[in-house]
Amino acid sequence: MSSYRVAQVGAAGAPFEITERTTRRPGPHEVRIAVDACGICHSDAMFVNGALPDVQFPLVTGHEIAGRVAETGDGTGGHWQVGDRVAVGWFGGSCHHCAACRQGDFVVCEELKVPGWSYDGGFGAEVIAPADALARIPTGLSAAEAAPMACAGVTTYNGLRRSPARPGDLVAVLGLGGLGHLGVRFAAAMGFETVAIARGADKAELAEELGAHHYIDSTAGTPVAEALRSLGGARVVLATAANSAAISATVDGLAHRGELVVIGADAEPLTITPAQLLMPGLVVRGHPSGTARDVEDTMAFSVLQGIRPMVETMPLEQANEAYGKMLAGTARFRMVLAHTEAGRAG
């Protein structure tokens, strides 16, 4: 029996430890993936800390997976072949029978499968995933570049393209981290007049490099909403920062019929009153990632526009250090665990 290495968490809040798992064959409608890279998302902390229901320990987290099909199970219909380059993100498969799935809205499936929650994630050299979770990686993206596109990329890209903003509209991106730096790049490439909002004057140069037309320093003294109104008001604010206070502070900067798209997860409540929403007809919407097809669209658009995530790679053995950098906010801008052939063979 062959084996492969994983970085697992033995109990809630425990550090990662390197251990081995026995390779198993994929079941019907599943594929086994040889993982080349896996991004580290802030949402991984919810799994590691046991903050979500039914999280099982020992845990192998990771839902920004890029690799190659190593083996196919029955019923994959010949669509996937050994060697195909694939990505798997937060959308790790759906049930196909709940009300949302029957309406074709698979990403809000009532029994959504998330890697690291429903089955072992990408902090290991192999993953067995449902075939409907697979997105084909296009030529032009490396594994380390493709992995973050399966969650951070698709969430920002989809959040913008499903918003009411149209080319030429003022669109603000709150936060310049793992999601935000991609959000700014996508917004600029989509033809929006792009505003980046972050903390500190030192981020202005980065915002310009990413393609932003304007930069708002949220610590400069002028309220963020006032700064947005001085630019004419935002048609859309894409809130990538996991900070409810910062998200709430943008609402009064929306133009009439504007939309706040929330993708940054924070346990604290938003402080928005009905009065703020009623008169200007504002919309507050949560946006949940995207399907495998959406991931493919994101990657195709990224190749077309020359957009790549800014990543820092580390080997699986340094999972604790890489995860720590993500938590501390010192990553520039997405930590990615890169796997080796040596980690797969036991």
Question: Language-model features: where?
Answer:
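Glycine-rich beta-strand-centered segment in the early N-terminal region that forms part
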Residues: 24-38, 51-99, 133, 138-144
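Helix-to-beta-strand junctions that scaffold the AdoMet/dcAdoMet cofactor pocket
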Residues: 254-255
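Rossmann-fold NAD(P)-binding glycine/threonine-rich loop
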Residues: 264-280, 292-298
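NAD(P)H dinucleotide-binding glycine-rich loop of Rossmann-like/cofactor-binding domains
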Residues: 94-174
